Amino acid sequence: PDSFIQKLNAAARREKSDALIIGEVWEDASNKIAYSERRRYFQGGELDSVMNYPLRDAIFGFLNGGTAEHFAESMECIRENYPRDVFYNLMNVVGTHDTARALTLLGVTENEWKMDRNGRAHYQLPPDRLEIALRRLRMAAVIQFTMPGSPTIYYGDEAGQQGFEDPFNRRTYPWGHENQELLAFYRKLCEIRAEEQTLADGDLQFSDTTAGALLRYERTSGDSRLVIAVNRGHQYVETKVDAL
């Protein structure tokens, strides 16, 4: 209940004045109704921000065949509904302990979900589907690291961990069996994120060329400008970048 979160907030602030309190809310937290009550998460004294499940849903929707326009609309809705400080402190997730592994979700079809529990427990993507899933996961990570918010990696996703629902998504880290190319890709994204302050606090603008399989947006701050383009389609796409 709100009263508990308020007490938790006050206790955390007494211990550490700049404590950050992130809530686990799967939906739009600005108008969340739970147990027949509208929650007051962002009205002061409760949550500083929340886990960005709407971003996760938008990423998977886009990479699994949805349109870039729908992705942009989903994110604009969250931006309009959330206070700016909340929006820029969102916990950007692609995988969590409550979801099937990102790599699995980006590679399986409906048929695999119909397998019995034992089948799902031992399932590994075949090479052709694994290659597709890895490409999609790299695109998902680019979006995760370049949208406003703090990118948060569920251990093992960066190493190519697979698994369906709990408990198959909670296996131990694959020490000695990591996908080294994927791991290097994530490390590079971490470096870029740490070096580019614009990714932390820059404005977000979706491009007019965002359409269909091409998602394009910009992060800008002062004289700094970053253009992010993600093409999930099977055809090469040219997109023009105007000079500052």
Language-model features and meaning:
Residues 1-90, 143, 160-188, 219-222, ...:
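Active-site-proximal helices and loops of the catalytic beta/alpha 8
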Residues 19, 23-25, 133, 140-141, ...:
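Small-side-chain structural scaffolding
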Residues 22-24, 92-95, 154-155, 226-231:
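Short beta-strand segments
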Residues 66, 72-198:
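Active-site-proximal substrate-binding groove within the catalytic cores of carbohydrate-active enzymes
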Residues 108-109, 205, 244:
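Short intrinsically disordered coil segments
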Residues 198-209:
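Short secondary-structure junctions
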Residues 207-243:
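Carbohydrate-binding surface patches
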